[in-house]
Swiss-Prot record:
Pfam families: MAGE
Protein name stated in the entry: Melanoma-associated antigen E1
Oligomeric and partner information: Interacts with DTNA. Interacts with TRIM28.
Region (Interaction with DTNA): 743-957
Subcellular location: Cytoplasm, Perinuclear region; Nucleus; Cell membrane
Top-level taxonomy: Eukaryota, Metazoa, Chordata, Craniata, Vertebrata
Record-linked PROSITE patterns: MAGE
Species in which this protein is naturally found: Homo sapiens
Any one of the GO BP annotations: negative regulation of transcription by RNA polymerase II
Region (Disordered): 1-455
Residues in MAGE domain copies: 491-690, 745-936
Length: 957
C-alpha cells in the first residue's frame, strides 16, 4: 500500500474519532443541563458580537484570518484577521474546511515567522504546527478535494476553544469550540499512536481541571484553563520530545495562570495571557527545542506581562506587550543563534517597555518601539549576530522612543515602520556605509562590534518634521542612547565665520570696520547683524577671553582686548613686536609729558636723540616715518591731526582710542621714569593726573576685583626686576656717577644708543675705544653710567640686549635673545642671504672636533663652490665679526692656524643647532654622530643651568 493511501486512511479514522468525541461533548454541555447554575454573564464576559472586548483584538481588515509562515526561501508571512461576524461564529461539526483562521507554521531551522497581534481578544485560536521531528517542512497545499486546517473560534458568549492537534507527522488538527458553561471536564487519555488528549473546562465552583498527558512519545496534551474566579489550573505537558503543548490561561483577572512548558520538546508552544486588567500572567516558554514561542500579553491597563523566551531553540519568539495600559511589559529573548525575536511594546500606555534582543543570534530581530505619549521604550540589540535585523520605529507624537539597531549581520537588514495615523511621523531613510568602522560613533561599553561581519552597514536617520534641524542617527553597534546630530544653524554658521575673521584680523592690530564684518555674513542674514555680532562677542569672551570693544562709534570700528591676565614683564624683547611697541611707548610718554599732545617735529627730535632718524631704515623696526604716520595711526594707537591756523601745515600727535583702552597714563609714566632713571613722582602734575585717571577707571568698572587685562605690550615692569644700577654699582671710578649734569648725561646716552643701532646691521663688535672716539674721550670718566643708560633704553624701547662680547678687549654688541632662540640658522649678513656660508663653516668646525685647520676650511669652501679669492674674504669677515677665532698651531713650520668658534657664534647659536643643520644637509639624524650628539646634549644642559643672560652689561673698567 502506498504512503498516500496510508495517510488518507489515518486522516479518515482520526476525523471519525474527533466527530464522535465532539458529539459526546454536545450531550454533556447542553444549555439547560440539570444540576448546573444558570448562565449569569460576568462583567468581563462579552455580551455579543459587537462587544468592545471582542473588537479589541480585531485589526482594521475584515477578511478571513490566514497566517501562512514561510520556509527559508519564501519570505515573510501574511496575516489577514477575520471580520467580527466570522470571528464569533462557531461550527458544530468539526470538518477540516470550516474555520476562518488557518496558520501553517514551518518546521524549525527552515525560516523565520513574524505574526501580528491576535484577532479576537477573548477567544483563542490555536494554530496548527507541523511536526518538529520530520526535519524540514514537508507540508503540501491541499488538493481540490481537500481543505486546509481550520481553527474555529468561539462566539462572543463562549469560553475559549480547545485545539485538538494531530499526532506528530500525521496531519492537521481541528479546533472545535465548546458551548458555554457545561459540566466538569473529563480527560480521556488515548492509547499510544491513536489520538490526542483533551481536557474540557469545568464550570464555576466545580474545582480545577487536571489534564493527564499522553504516555506515548507522539501524543498531544491540551489544557483548557478554569473559568473566572476559580482555582488555578495546572497543565502537565507531555514528556515526549515531539509533542505540542498549548496552555490556555483564564479570562478573568483574579486567578493567576501558570503554564509549565515542555522541557525537551521541539514543537511550538503557544501561550495566551489573560485579558483582564488586574491579573498577572507568567508564561514560561520551552527552554530547549526548535519550535516557536508566541506570548500574547494582557490588554488591560495595569496588568504585568512577563514572557521568558526559549533559550536554546532555533525557532521564533514573539512577545506582544499590553496595548492600552500603564503596565510593564518585559520580553527576554532567546539566546540561540538562529532564532527570531519580535517585541511589540505598548501602544498608548504610560509604562516603559523593555525589549532585550538576542545576544548571539543569527536570525531576524524585530523590535517595535512604543507609540504612546508617555511611555518610553528601550531596545538593546544583539551584539555579534549574523542574521538580519528588523526595526520598527515609533510613530506617536509625544512618546519618546529610543531604538537601536542590532549589529551588522550576514543577511540584509529590513526596516519596518508602524502605520499610525498621527501628525508627527518621523521620516526614515537607509544609509549604506562602506566600512563598519563608521558606525563606531556611539557604542555602549558592554557591547562589542561584529567579528568578521561582511556586507554594507546601515544607519537609520530620523528627521523630525517640526524640527528640521534635528537629526537622530541610530546605527549598528550602538545601545540605549542614540546619536543625535544637529546640523549647524545658518545663524551659528554666520557667527562662526565672523568669529574666525575677528581672530585673524586682530593679529594685524588694525581696527575692524563694521563693513568688513558684514562681508563675512550671508546676504540673507545681514539684516540680523546685531544679533550675530552679539553672539560672536559672547563666544570671544567665553572661549578666547577677548573683549570686543567698540573703538569709534561714528566710524563703527571695533578692537579686541585681551582678558587672559597679566604676563610677567621681562622686557619688550619677549613680545613679537617688542621694538615697535617700545618705540610707541616712548612716543606716548612724550605726548603725555608734553601736555597730552605733541607736534610732529618734537616727536622726531626726541627720536633723533634716541638714535632714530626719519629717513634712515633700521633693521629693528623698518622705516620709522611709515611706522609713525601710517602704521600706528591705522592701528589707532596715535591720532594724527593738522594744527589749525598754521602755515605751512603742521601736524600733532595725540593718544589714539586704542592706547586709552590698552594702557594707562600711570603705566606710561612709570615706563618713562625707568628710561630716565627717575621716580614717577618727579613729575607731580602728571602723577596726580595719572592717579585721577586710575580712580575714574576703577569707578567706571564698578570696582571690580579682577579688572580687565590687556595685551602684554603695555604691562608695567614687575617689582622683582633688578635695578640696573645695583648690578653695576661696584664699578671702579674716581668720579661720582652723577657728577655731570643730568642733561649732559642724557644727551651722551642717547648718542651712544644711536651708535649701537647703526653698528648692529654690520654685525661687527664695537670696542670701547671706538665708542669713546664717537661720543668724546671726556666721557671715559662716566663711561659705565652712560653705558647703563644706553643699555636700559635699548632694552625697554628696542627690545635688545647690550652684552659684552669680549671682556679683554672691551668690545660690545647687541643681542636679540628671542630672535636668536627661535632662529635655527644664523647668517652673517641679513641683506645677502645667498652669500652666507656661516652655518656651514661652524658645523664643519664642530664635526671636525671643535677646531679645524685653515687649509681644511678653505678646501671645504672650495667644495661649496667658493672661488679661490673669495675664501680669504669670507674667513676674514667671520674673524672680524667674532664668529670664529684663529689660533696658532704650536710647533708648526711654516706657521699654520686653526679656526674655532668665536664668542658671537657661542652667543647666537649652539652645538645642537649646528648638528641638526648638518643632519638636514646629509638627510640623517643627529644621533648618527654619537660623540658630537653627546657633546651637544651636555652643551644644552649647561645653557639651561646658566639660565637667562643678564640683560645689562657690567665688568666695566
Amino acid at each position: 500500500m502506498s504512503l498516500v493511501s496510508q495517510n488518507s486512511r489515518r486522516r479518515r479514522r482520526r476525523v471519525a474519532k474527533a466527530t464522535a468525541h465532539n458529539s459526546s461533548w454536545g450531550e454533556m454541555q447542553a444549555p439547560n443541563a440539570p444540576g448546573l447554575p444558570a448562565d449569569v454573564p460576568g462583567s468581563d464576559v462579552p455580551q455579543g458580537p459587537s462587544d468592545s472586548q471582542i473588537l479589541q483584538g480585531l485589526c482594521a481588515s475584515e477578511g478571513p484570518s490566514t497566517s501562512v509562515l514561510p520556509t527559508s526561501a519564501e519570505g515573510p508571512s501574511t496575516f489577514v484577521p477575520p471580520t467580527i461576524s466570522e470571528a464569533s461564529s462557531a461550527s458544530g461539526q468539526p470538518t477540516i474546511s470550516e474555520g476562518p483562521g488557518t496558520s501553517v507554521l514551518p518546521t524549525p531551522s527552515e525560516g523565520l515567522s513574524t505574526s501580528g497581534p491576535p484577532t479576537i481578544s477573548k477567544g483563542l485560536c490555536t494554530s496548527v504546527t507541523l511536526a518538529a521531528s520530520e526535519g524540514r517542512n514537508t507540508s503540501r497545499p491541499p488538493t481540490s478535494s481537500e481543505e486546509p486546517s481550520t481553527s474555529v473560534p468561539p462566539t462572543a458568549s463562549e469560553v475559549p476553544s480547545t485545539s485538538l492537534p494531530p499526532t506528530p507527522g500525521e496531519g492537521t488538527s481541528t479546533s472545535v469550540p465548546p458551548t458555554a458553561y457545561e459540566g466538569p471536564s473529563t480527560s480521556v487519555v488515548p492509547t499510544p499512536d491513536e489520538g490526542p488528549s483533551t481536557s474540557v473546562l469545568p464550570t464555576p465552583g466545580e474545582g480545577p481541571g487536571t489534564s493527564v498527558p499522553l504516555a506515548a512519545t507522539e501524543g498531544l496534551s491540551t489544557s483548557v484553563q478554569a473559568t473566572p474566579d476559580e482555582g488555578p489550573s495546572t497543565s502537565v505537558p507531555p514528556t515526549a520530545t515531539e509533542g505540542l503543548s498549548t496552555p490556555v490561561p483564564p479570562t478573568r483577572d483574579e486567578g493567576p495562570s501558570t503554564s509549565v512548558p515542555a522541557t525537551p520538546g521541539e514543537g511550538p508552544s503557544t501561550s495566551v495571557l489573560p485579558a483582564a486588567s488586574d491579573g498577572q500572567s507568567i508564561s514560561l516558554v520551552p527552554t530547549r527545542g526548535k519550535g516557536s514561542s508566541t506570548s500574547v500579553p494582557p490588554t488591560a491597563t495595569e496588568g504585568l506581562s512577563t514572557s521568558v523566551q526559549p533559550t536554546a531553540g532555533e525557532g521564533s519568539s514573539t512577545s506582544v506587550p499590553p496595548t492600552p495600559g500603564g503596565g510593564l511589559s518585559t520580553s527576554v529573548p532567546p539566546t540561540a543563534t538562529e532564532e527570531l525575536s519580535t517585541s511589540v511594546p505598548p501602544t498608548p500606555g504610560e509604562g516603559p517597555s523593555t525589549s532585550v534582543l538576542p545576544i548571539p543570534g543569527e536570525g531576524l530581530s524585530t523590535s517595535v518601539p512604543p507609540t504612546a505619549s508617555d511611555g518610553s521604550d528601550t531596545s538593546v540589540p544583539p551584539t555579534p549576530g549574523e542574521g538580519a535585523s528588523t526595526l520598527v520605529q515609533p510613530t506617536a507624537p509625544d512618546g519618546p522612543g529610543s531604538s537601536v539597531l542590532p549589529n551588522p549581520g550576514e543577511g540584509p537588514s529590513t526596516l519596518f515602520s508602524s502605520s499610525a495615523s498621527v501628525d508627527r511621523n518621523p521620516s526614515k531613510c537607509s544609509l549604506v556605509l562602506p566600512s563598519p568602522r563608521v558606525t563606531k560613533a556611539s557604542v555602549d561599553s558592554d557591547s562589542e562590534g561584529p567579528k568578521g561581519a561582511e556586507g554594507p552597514i546601515e544607519f537609520e536617520v530620523l528627521r523630525d518634521c517640526e524640527s528640521p534641524n534635528s537629526i537622530s542617527i541610530m546605527g549598528l553597534n550602538t545601545s540605549r542612547v542614540a546619536i543625535t546630530l544637529k546640523p549647524q544653524d545658518p545663524m551659528e554658521q554666520n557667527v562662526a565665520e565672523l568669529l574666525q575673521f575677528l581672530l585673524v584680523k586682530d593679529q594685524s592690530k588694525y581696527p575692524i570696520r563694521e563693513s568688513e564684518m558684514r562681508e563675512y555674513i550671508v546676504k540673507e542674514y545681514r539684516n540680523q547683524f546685531p544679533e550675530i555680532l552679539r553672539r560672536a562677542a559672547a563666544h570671544l569672551e567665553c572661549i578666547f577671553r577677548f573683549e570686543l570693544r567698540e573703538l569709534d562709534p561714528e566710524a563703527h570700528t571695533y578692537i579686541l582686548l585681551n582678558k587672559l591676565g597679566p604676563v610677567p614683564f621681562e622686557g619688550l624683547e619677549e613680545s613679537p613686536n617688542g621694538p615697535k611697541m617700545g618705540l610707541l611707548m616712548m612716543i606716548l610718554g612724550q605726548i603725555f609729558l608734553n601736555g597730552n599732545q605733541a607736534k610732529e617735529a618734537e616727536i622726531w627730535e626726541m627720536l633723533w636723540r634716541m638714535g632714530v632718524q626719519r629717513e634712515r631704515r633700521l633693521s629693528i623696526f623698518g622705516n620709522p616715518k611709515r611706522l609713525l604716520s601710517v602704521e600706528f595711526v591705522w592701528q589707532r594707537y596715535l591720532d594724527y591731526r593738522p594744527v589749525t591756523d598754521c602755515k605751512p601745515v603742521e601736524y600733532e600727535f595725540f593718544w589714539g582710542p586704542r592706547s586709552h583702552l590698552e594702557t594707562t597714563k600711570m603705566k606710561i609714566l612709570k615706563f618713562m621714569a625707568k628710561i630716565y632713571n627717575k621716580d614717577p613722582m618727579d613729575w607731580p602734575e602728571k602723577y596726580n593726573e595719572a592717579l585721577e585717571e586710575d580712580a575714574a577707571r576703577a569707578f567706571a568698572e564698578g570696582w571690580q576685583a579682577l579688572p580687565h587685562f590687556r595685551r602684554p605690550f603695555f604691562e608695567e615692569a614687575a617689582a622683582e626686576v633688578p635695578s640696573p644700577d645695583s648690578e653695576v654699582s661696584s664699578y671702579s671710578s674716581k668720579y661720582a656717577p652723577h657728577s655731570w649734569p643730568e642733561s649732559r648725561l642724557e644727551s651722551k646716552a642717547r648718542k651712544l644708543v644711536q651708535l649701537f643701532l647703526l653698528m648692529d646691521s654690520t654685525k661687527l663688535p664695537i670696542p670701547k675705544k671706538g665708542i669713546l672716539y664717537y661720543i668724546g674721550r671726556e666721557c671715559s670718566k662716566v663711561f659705565p653710567d652712560l653705558l647703563n643708560r644706553a643699555a636700559r633704553t635699548l632694552n625697554h624701547v628696542y627690545g635688545t640686549e647690550l652684552v659684552v662680547l669680549d671682556p679683554r678687549n672691551h668690545s660690545y654688541t647687541l643681542y636679540n635673545r628671542r630672535e636668536m632662540e627661535e632662529t635655527e640658522e644664523i647668517v652673517d649678513s641679513p641683506n645677502r642671504p645667498g652669500n652666507n656660508f656661516l652655518m656651514q663653516v661652524l658645523s664643519f668646525i664642530f664635526i671636525m672636533g671643535n677646531h679645524a685647520r685653515e687649509s681644511a676650511v678653505w678646501a671645504f669652501l672650495r667644495g661649496l663652490g667658493v672661488q679661490a679669492g673669495r675664501k680669504h674674504v669670507i674667513t676674514c669677515r667671520y674673524l672680524s665679526q667674532r664668529y670664529i677665532d684663529s689660533l696658532r698651531v704650536p710647533d708648526s713650520d711654516p706657521v699654520q692656524y686653526e679656526f674655532v668658534w668665536g664668542p658671537r657664534a657661542r652667543l647666537e647659536t649652539s652645538k645642537m643647532k649646528a648638528l641638526r643643520y648638518v643632519a638636514r644637509i646629509h638627510r640623517k639624524e643627529p644621533q648618527d654622530w654619537p660623540q658630537q650628539y653627546r657633546e651637544a646634549m651636555e652643551d644644552e644642559a649647561n645653557r639651561a643651568d646658566v639660565g637667562h643672560r643678564q640683560i645689562f652689561v657690567h665688568n666695566f673698567r
